[in-house]
Amino acid sequence: GFGWLLSLRESVRNDKLLAPNLYLGGPIWNGSELDWYATVVRDPERARSLVREHQAAGYDFIKVHNVLKPNVYDAILDEAKKLNIDVVGHIPHEIALSKAIASGQRTFEHLKGYYSDRSLEITKEDYVGLTKGAEVWNCPTLYTNRIGFRGDDVRTLLESDEAKYISNDERGEWLAATAGG
């Protein structure tokens, strides 16, 4: 999300705009500059400072992405716990699923933390055993990532009924990314 959404949420809360309740996070946090929409966080003190800034601004949660060093991730979760603000999002590549659960991250996007955690045998029992009673939510959203998982042809995917939910900009990016091969 972006800062302008905070004022939109206030309009909803003050009955100036008829809309559903908005629960907002700021831009996703990542250790890489490759995601143009991400806030780059590479050191623990900046991470702690950003948690405080986001909490003071009124965001409901912090969303983390794939490329965060363990010490930065730990600082985010520690500071967020102190300030009672949820951390949601991806499980960073260098973080084990068991650590993400123990640290208090509230949601896991795309189930990546499960299938990329090399400490698991990837059995039903592993999934259930790690998450049962952990008070975490999984947001699978796997369909739109199907290309990366199974190598499906982009054009075939974009012709499916479900593809109507993919924006024209995103369609263009997918087609451009596969044009060379």
Residues of each region from the PLM?
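Active-site neighborhoods of metal-dependent hydrolases
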Residues: L50-L68, Y114-G181
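Active-site loop-helix segments enriched in His/Asp/Glu that coordinate
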Residues: G1-E45, Y59, V64-T131
